């Protein structure tokens, strides 16, 4: 029996589209300062799965704003630089590993796209995006 140590996860920033205008489509890519970022630490070289629970809409009051995540809206790297990120589809479970030498670390990013209608009511729209990280056992 091999008992792995614990996984620690720290959300370093939220996905932020900034100010957007009506009648537009706005994308925040993984390598943008607006992308969400998590730092994960655990057993060096351990396999992990990344599972996102993503919203379909952002909301303020009863008003909604569509949000989507394409097949390159997720990114992960042993380095804390999205330029080196391996892109993945956050709509599917993603399997990877923590850095195999030194501290077992992984940085994860999330981008996304909002579609703003011509009649979109103003407001600060929000919704939770949840990341679950689990050891794979390998």
Listing of model-derived features with the role each one plays in the protein:
Residues 59-98:
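Terminal beta-strand-rich extracellular "head" domains
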Residues 1-63, 97-138:
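N-terminal small/polar-rich segments of proteins
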